[in-house]
């Protein structure tokens, strides 16, 4: 529990903290009060006291509570509306495979529930009873499909599809990457420390997200050692195919001439801060223009760049709701599991905006 100090009013300077008692000069508490409450005395002796009021933003608790209460039900219906349009591969010979749409439904819904395969069996039975799927998929079959490489492009398309209901809402975007832990470890012998060292491996996800609703509009999964900078052009281009992009914010790791050009090519303005050793010359007119804007209009630049912090909220939303690690053991299964987390997150954002903004989910069958 923190300590409480008694401060005088604006008419005098005093504080009961040990720092003020010892030095008899302004302590941090007095400075804090003066920054919040200022006193001005004019020539006639009139005193004007100005108090700084912190701006607060109200929460639409009514619609938020409603969306939370019906989230699971609407999630299942929205997901079924997407997966029911997935066609199974043509049957040729051998034992018929499980319906692909039902299998993808079970994969995404299992990640949403964060249960093990066996405990998730009850949810699949309920989904079949509500006619959201045609066949209940055994959990071992579902795990086998997580390992299929040909499902990865389909899941990426589902990420894009689930973001489309918000294409009229989002115009400013941010890009960043985040890691998801795995159960795999790597070991090596360190000659410096004279012992074997082990560390947990993780999967890196590169996101483009809208700064208003935190919807993910572009995603790419790579290994933990891949750099962030080269991934921006592809993700921005994919987002621009469905969204009217006005701004793209990113941290210094994405600073390069190629990235600035890629953002300009889609009609957006880049807000990427320059490094301390960056120079204005040598990289073309676009680089020079953005460098001078950053240096001469830094306050205005930071007002736009601050939107980048919303992608940190996106990362937190995904990890806190659907887990910050993956259960799968193989690389392909880990990639597909992370993509399922992103699909779950997008559907959650769509459900939230259905109640707060009144949008419609056009991908429902």
Set out the residue ranges of the language-model regions.
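Helix-centered, glycine/charged polyanion-binding patches within enzymatic domains
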Residues: 252-253, 257-320
């Amino acid at each position: 529990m923190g300590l409480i100090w008694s401060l005088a009013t604006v008419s005098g300077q005093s504080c009961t903290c040990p720092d003020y008692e010892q030095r008899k000069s302004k302590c941090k508490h007095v400075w804090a009060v003066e920054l919040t409450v200022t006193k001005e005395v004019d020539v006639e002796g009139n005193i004007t006291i100005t108090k700084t009021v912190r701006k607060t933003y109200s929460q639409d608790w009514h619609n938020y509570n409603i969306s939370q209460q019906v989230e699971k039900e609407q999630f299942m219906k929205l997901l079924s509306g997407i997966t029911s349009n997935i066609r199974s591969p043509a049957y040729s010979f051998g034992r018929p495979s499980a319906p692909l749409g039902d299998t993808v439904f079970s994969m995404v819904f299992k990640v949403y529930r964060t249960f093990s395969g066996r405990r998730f069996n009850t949810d699949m039975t309920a989904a079949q009873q509500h006619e959201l799927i045609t066949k209940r998929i055994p959990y071992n079959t579902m795990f086998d499909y997580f390992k299929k490489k040909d499902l990865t492009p389909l899941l990426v398309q589902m990420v894009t599809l689930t973001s489309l209901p918000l294409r009229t809402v989002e115009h400013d975007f941010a890009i960043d990457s985040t890691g998801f832990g795995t159960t795999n470890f790597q070991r090596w012998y360190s000659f410096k420390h004279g012992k074997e060292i082990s560390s947990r491996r993780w999967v890196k996800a590169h996101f483009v997200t809208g700064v208003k609703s935190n919807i993910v509009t572009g995603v790419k999964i790579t290994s933990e050692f891949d750099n962030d900078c080269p991934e921006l052009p592809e993700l921005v281009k994919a987002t621009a195919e469905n969204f009217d992009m006005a701004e793209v914010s990113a941290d210094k790791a994405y600073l390069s001439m190629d990235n600035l050009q890629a953002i300009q090519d889609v009609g957006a303005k880049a807000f990427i801060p320059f490094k301390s050793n960056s120079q204005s010359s040598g990289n073309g007119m676009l680089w020079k223009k953005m460098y001078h804007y950053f240096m001469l209009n830094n306050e205005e630049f930071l007002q736009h760049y601050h939107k980048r912090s919303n992608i940190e909220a996106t990362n937190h939303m995904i990890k806190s709701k659907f887990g910050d690690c993956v259960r799968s053991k193989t690389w392909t299964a880990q990639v597909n599991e992370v993509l399922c987390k992103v699909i779950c997150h997008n559907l959650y954002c769509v459900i939230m905006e259905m109640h707060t903004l009144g949008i419609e989910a056009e991908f429902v069958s």
